[in-house]
Design a protein with these regions (language model features):
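Positively charged n-region of N-terminal signal peptides that target proteins for export
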Residues: 1-4
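Bacterial N-terminal signal peptides
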Residues: 7-15
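N-terminal signal peptide c-region/cleavage motif recognized by signal peptidases
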Residues: 17-19
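Cleaved targeting-peptide boundary
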Residues: 21-29
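Extracellular/mature segments of secreted proteins
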Residues: 36-43
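Compact alpha-helical subdomains of small soluble proteins
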Residues: 44, 48-102
Length: 102
């Protein structure tokens, strides 16, 4: 699972951040990325079909529009997990921690 998280995190960081960010910008970026992860996790818990997740998540977005590009990537990552793992883990906290560690 960690390899999958790292690969997804790297791809998402490239998609949204571009050049190296200053510390505060990095924190903001990681916070928005974590919000995307939390929204996708909630969609999975609400049993939204995988193909309907992008529209459902974008409708409730609380982050800048540029972070919407990560929704398909995060969706596939969350939906390949077992439901018990999605239920018992705080995926957004794990994502944010790994993002800040980069």
């Amino acid at each position: 699972m960690n390899k999958t998280i790292l690969a997804a995190l790297a791809a998402m960081s490239m998609a949204v951040s571009g050049p190296a960010l200053a510390a505060s910008k990095k924190e903001d970026s990681c916070m928005h990325q974590a919000a995307v992860v939390a929204a996708v996790q909630q969609a999975r818990l609400d049993r939204v079909k995988e193909r309907e997740v992008p529209a459902a998540v974008k409708a409730k977005a609380t982050w800048p529009e540029s972070f919407n590009t990560a929704i398909p990537l995060v969706t596939s990552w969350v939906y390949e997990m077992k439901m018990r793992d999605v239920k018992k883990n705080d995926l957004s906290a794990a994502w944010k921690e790994m993002c800040l560690a980069q």
